[in-house]
Each structure stands twice: as C-alpha cells, then as structure tokens.
C-alpha cells in the first residue's frame, strides 16, 4: 500500500522530469522535447543528443507513441528509485547490521544467538512470523544456530531490495 509520502515523492519526480525536458513549457513531454533538451545540455552535439534521447525515449515511452504520459514517467521514476535502492542496499544493510549488533550482541562476538535474536523481536514488539524459530532458520544460512553479521547483512539487503521491487511493481497510486 502506498502512502501519501510515496505519492508525493513520485509526483515531485514527475514534475522534475517534466521541468527538465518540457522546453516549450506546454505541460507535456514528447520525444522531440527530450531530443531538444539533450541537444541544449550537450552543447549542440547532434549525435550525442540523438543517442541519449533515443535511450531515454525507449526507456520511458512504453507504448512508443512519442508522448510521455504521467504513468510512463512515474514508472520510470519508480524504476530509477528502485535501482538506487538496489545500489545502496549493501551499504545500508551494513549499517543496519552494525546497529543491530551494537544493541543486541551482548557478548560482542559478531553473531546473534537465539536468545539475543529473540531480544530483537521483543524490542520491536512484534514478529513478522508467528514462530521466531522460523525467522532464525530463514536467516541462519549455515544452520549453526546463530546469525552471523554476514547472514544479517544478506537478510537486510534482501529485505531492502524486495521492498524496492514491490514499490516499483506497484507503480504510482494516483
């Protein structure tokens, strides 16, 4: 379910896209507008402008009618946001792991035992699954009964990427 914040961000990205490429300020964007915008940004280099416009147009204009609808631009913006999340998922997951270990790894061995892991769920006030053991089994890839920093990082990274895919697949909710 998208939030007003999600819709506001997508709307802002669409507005930014239109502002950047709608040179004649008629409120719509066509493939010619894209080309002219790139031509201006690339100091009149016809070849580079044509190439860049072709790539962007083939990416955004899904029905190939030469015009960009709100849905097409919003999907493009959502896909770009997803790419950014995927590119940053590794770094963000590492920060998540460090914060989690700092708070719950009582013996500072860079692993969470079942007892330490259960503390995480108690602190959150809920469990995404009915059985905490099931969650531990999902994250504990080497099945040693503990969750290592690497296993946590993979789990956090996967959750971030899955979320980005879900947001992108959902598209705008207007």
UniProtKB/Swiss-Prot annotation:
Start and end residues of each EF-hand domain: 9-44, 60-83, 92-127, 133-162
GO molecular function: calcium ion binding
Residues annotated to bind Ca(2+) 2: 105, 107, 109, 111, 116
PROSITE patterns on file: EF_HAND_1, EF_HAND_2
Alphabetical UniProt keywords: Calcium, Metal-binding, Repeat
SMART domains in UniProt: EFh
Pfam family, one: EF-hand_7
Chain residues that bind Ca(2+) 3: 140, 142, 144, 146, 151
Positions contributing to Ca(2+) 1 binding: 22, 24, 26, 28, 33
This protein's name: Calcium-binding protein F
Name of the coding gene: cbpF
